[in-house]
Amino acid sequence: MKKLMFVTDESILGGCARSGVAEVVDSLANSVAADYAVTVVCPDGNGVWARMAANLQQVSDGVRFCRLFGVDYYLLRRWPDGLNMVVEHTKPDVLHNFAAPELLTTLATRPPRCIYTIDQADFMQGREDTLRLYDAVTTVSKAYAIELLERGDQLSQVLGEINFRGITNGILTSVFAPEKGLMTSAKYSADDFSGKAVCKERLCRTYGIPADKCIYLMMCRLVRDKGIDDVLKAVHMIRDSGGFLLLVGKGEKQYEEQLAKLTRDDGVLWVNRWPSAVQAVPLLAGADFYLSPSVAEPCGLMPMTACRYGCIPITTLNGGLQDNMDDEIAVIVHEDGVTGAVAKVAALYAHPDALIAKRAACMERDFSWATRKAEYLEVYRGAV
């Protein structure tokens, strides 16, 4: 079996997660483990999974090893020191880099095939020409790939001259599985939503939300690109239509200051933290709708995950959201913004049969890597 190495500065299992990149790395690694002998090299964040691993080993000074869910993890205390050692030790046939593109130049021995994935265009500023070092470059959705090619800047010029494509991310549906009751208060499915009512009751008790409210959930970095301005304009519309906004996240000072002034009387509870995947799942299981009115969105992992829990997305169709969201499973935000979408949500919430049908459609939509990993396997094999 050929060897595939992921190089990343983010991994949930490695305990160094800051964004959706961490989830993508771990879930894609798990998904292709039947096709390749997979190794993940990442910073050692003393993650709970690593601490629980019975076979955690000290490989060398500052490098620990563990095997989790069929994938070998090398955890580096001093990132990225030690990467050369791991590459020499494992000798991968394919290296897939999710971290800084220039890391490839630090390797004493270049693997036969090297792939790079762009998650955020802003991260590439000043690094554009390093992409030419790779055999193939991908980004996290087909729609975002088109946006990058149409930017009219140095990045779009380089991408137009190299082997570049968009591959829409999937999620690990074996973990985000309400029918198994993993990380939720009760099991439920698209055929039986009784457990979701239990999860909502638990959420309301935990956060002191009146049980009769339609719960809008938003979990994100508090930045303009996530559509937070539009959400703040709609706060009182949400309240007056019988809703309650639970917003979890932290970010720019201007937004934190605005949220700090809002109270439960405004129908808002702001939780100033970024939840881990384990903490996010009970929120999705208990909430009715998930707000994702992004101005710019490379992929949109959270709306996909929300669908798994019957938490209906309220979303724009910007960036990667075009690849994943539509009217069947989401309330689409149009020119009238979140305020206009809230009116649609209130009407939907007032008709239980229609609400249940849309929730079921959400949960039944296939966002798994099973339908998407084939494109990555083509890239790894050099078929494209």
Which residues does each predicted region cover?
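Catalytic cores of nucleotide-sugar-dependent glycosyltransferases that transfer UDP/GDP/TDP-activated
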Residues: 1-384
